[in-house]
Every structure is written in C-alpha cells, then in structure tokens.
C-alpha cells in the first residue's frame, strides 16, 4: 500500500487566532458553515469542506501519515478532533511536526525544503518509504517544488473567504489520487 503524508494548516483545516478577529459577527457567520472547534479560546479551527469523506478515502487506500509545520500540541489537537474522533478505526502511522521541518530545512539548505520526503529513506533509513510509494499533500508551493513527482498540491483553504464553504478541492484531489492509484 502506498504512503500519503498530509499537511494540516490550509490543506485540511484553517485556523484563525481569536486575537486577530476584527469583525466578530462576520467571523461567527463564516464559521457556522463549517465543522469547527474552539482550541482553548486561542484558535477557531474549521475543517475544509468534504474533509471526512476525503479522509475515509485516504484511510481505505493509503497508509496515512501527517507532516505539519505546526507544534506538537496544536497538531495533536487537530489530529484528535478532526481526524481520529470522527472515526476511531483510523490509524495514523507517523506524525512529523515543526521540529522535523527544521531538520529538513537544515539538511536540504539549497532547496529550502521544509518537508523533504527523501529524508525518510536516505537520512532516517525508514524501509517502508521510498520515492515510488510515498507522497505528500500540501498547499505550499515550496513543498511541491522540492519534490514535484511526489507532491499533490491543493489550493490553500481559508474559511473567512467568501464562498469557501463551496470549496471542492478535496473532492478534486480524490479524483486525482484515484487516477494515480490505477
């Protein structure tokens, strides 16, 4: 089975710090269109449209992993609330955080690559990963540029944008992944 790494911020979810809210009415109206969670009155985090069906598809067809530039505590909250709590049978095999992004940038200085998948098999010698079976889904162009053949790009998701509740990006990506699997 192939491996897929998922980015969190602006790929699967969008988080807005409460301290940045200037129009509380609009903020609440926008959030009402989404599955959202309040993280300790610090962040309001909204799941991207079609997140759960997309995750169902991924967990059925891939070994699922996370690679995020977020801190461990923040990422753990998102993983628990948006991924695992919705379906306790889901299993995430490996989670990489901000620390791993810093290591990647240090190792791949010339490319400034914060999530270089190659590290898994060349530096860390993890035998279940290789360039033929390991991919990442991310919204950052830098991630795509550093591994063109192993990255599936998505448009960044921002729930405060008008019409963001109609976002179809995860369903589009599901079709792309389906073609890639076959």
UniProtKB/Swiss-Prot annotation:
Recorded GO MF terms: phosphoprotein phosphatase activity
Record domain FCP1 homology: where: 1-180
Family annotation (InterPro entries): FCP1_dom, HAD-like_sf, HAD_sf, TIM50
SUPFAM superfamilies assigned to the protein according to its UniProt record, in alphabetical order: HAD-like (SSF56784)
Keywords assigned: Hydrolase, Protein phosphatase
PROSITE patterns: FCP1
EC numbers for this chain: 3.1.3.-
Keyword Hydrolase: yes
Superkingdom per UniProt: Viruses
Known function: May function as a phosphatase.
Family: Belongs to the IIV-6 355R family.
Name of the protein this chain belongs to: Putative CTD phosphatase-like protein 355R
Organism: Invertebrate iridescent virus 6
């Amino acid at each position: 089975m192939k491996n897929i790494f998922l980015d969190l911020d602006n790929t699967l979810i969008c988080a807005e710090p409460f301290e940045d809210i200037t129009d509380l009415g609009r903020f609440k109206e926008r959030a009402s269109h989404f599955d959202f969670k309040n993280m300790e009155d610090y962040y309001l985090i909204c799941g991207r449209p079609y997140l759960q069906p997309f995750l169902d598809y991924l967990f059925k067809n891939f070994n699922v992993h996370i690679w995020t530039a977020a801190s461990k505590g923040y990422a753990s909250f998102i993983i628990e609330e948006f991924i695992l709590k919705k379906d306790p049978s889901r299993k995430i095999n490996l989670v990489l955080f901000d620390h791993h992004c810093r290591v990647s940038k240090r190792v791949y200085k010339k490319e400034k690559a914060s999530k270089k998948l190659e590290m898994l098999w060349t530096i860390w010698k993890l035998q279940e990963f290789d360039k033929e079976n390991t991919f990442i889904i991310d919204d950052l162009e830098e991630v795509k540029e550093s591994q063109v053949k192993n990255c599936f790009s998505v448009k960044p998701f921002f729930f405060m944008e008008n019409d963001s509740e109609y976002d179809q990006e995860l369903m589009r990506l599901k079709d792309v992944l389906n073609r890639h699997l076959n």
